Amino acid sequence: MSQSTIESTNKKEINKGKAPAKETILSPRFYTTDFEAMENMDLSINEEELEAICEEFRKDYNRHHFVRNSEFEGAAEKLDPETRELFVDFLEGSCTSEFSGFLLYKELSKRIKDKNPLLAECFAHMARDEARHAGFLNKSMSDFGLQLDLGFLTANKDYTYFPPRSIFYATYLSEKIGYWRYIAIYRHLEKNPNSKIFPLFNYFENWCQDENRHGDFFDALMKAQPRTVKSLSQKITIGGSTFTHPLFDYFHRFRYFLNNLPLTSKLWSRFFLLAVFATMYARDLGIKKDFYSSLGLDARDYDQFVINKTNETAARVFPVVMDVNNKSFYGRLDKIVENNKILSDIASGTGNKVSKTFRKVPKYLSNGYQLLRLYLLKPLDSKDYQPSIR
């Protein structure tokens, strides 16, 4: 989980008056998936709950919530240069993340609407919410004389492929962790109004309910997983070439059989929980630490609260969750943060590329070791963890 920069292949600016943020492995990603598998999903196991959630989406509770008021007038000018830079960076990352969700949900709703209309409608409603969030954030950026070119982002961002099952895990956690992040900030600023640096935060209470409903949708979708796929593709891709044969259907069925074994689900649950928690912790205690300080928040306390709550929430749908109360859990995450700081110092320090690489290797290996030990940490069985959920 280092913060080493991945060189961008396109140097064109993505907003007016501001160079694009450097892309790192901690940056928001744009995703694509197997649309054929998605359109063939069998929802019958949990269709009633999915229909109820879709009805909630139709009501669009926040239709009139994201309306700017007079508090925004002149608010940008009140920020000192350092806080301004931190806040604009927050806006850019948040807007990119919300827009990434919009693109994925919109494309899913369009590609599966003929064969899976209920699923398509749910994705369309979520795309509406994500677009609204991204637009509201982008409007706040315009208060600082900046604006993300979302059309440019759509055309020029690299897209990462995730199979549907991985999309479910990752997006469920993203939405639920988003809920806890937003509500924690809102409640903190409600008690400490002097730390509210911008009126955008007044909208976080209702905003986080969109995130929560999206997470509930993926919860319901994952509960329909025992018989997810009706008919599987007769295609297989090898080395960039696609081949078609009826026998390939059995290959896919065997692959999905393996993926649906109880042990497999437990391993994937641990993987995605750790990936999301470690990424957030490394980012927030590293490059985002000063931003949370500007809100009067201690980044470590804030992240540990969010991780603990998200872990509890995940126990409702994942078979196992992380043992976040084990004393080594946060100790190892802190070690990763410490390693990342050293890696950053090496990157910005003196020395040639070869010597820097040799100095970085031990820290990369240490990060890998910490993550492996965290993954191998005995998980908690969700059925035993459920009573702690409120």
From Swiss-Prot:
Pfam families in alphabetical order: Rubrerythrin (PF02915)
EC main group: oxidoreductase
Keyword Oxidoreductase: yes
Enzyme Commission number: 1.14.13.81
Entry keyword set: Chlorophyll biosynthesis, Iron, Metal-binding, NADP, Oxidoreductase, Photosynthesis
Biological process, per Gene Ontology: light-independent chlorophyll biosynthetic process; photosynthesis
Swiss-Prot/TrEMBL catalytic activity: Mg-protoporphyrin IX 13-monomethyl ester + 3 NADPH + 3 O2 + 2 H(+) = 3,8-divinyl protochlorophyllide a + 3 NADP(+) + 5 H2O
Pathway where it operates: Porphyrin-containing compound metabolism; chlorophyll biosynthesis (light-independent)
Protein name: Magnesium-protoporphyrin IX monomethyl ester [oxidative] cyclase
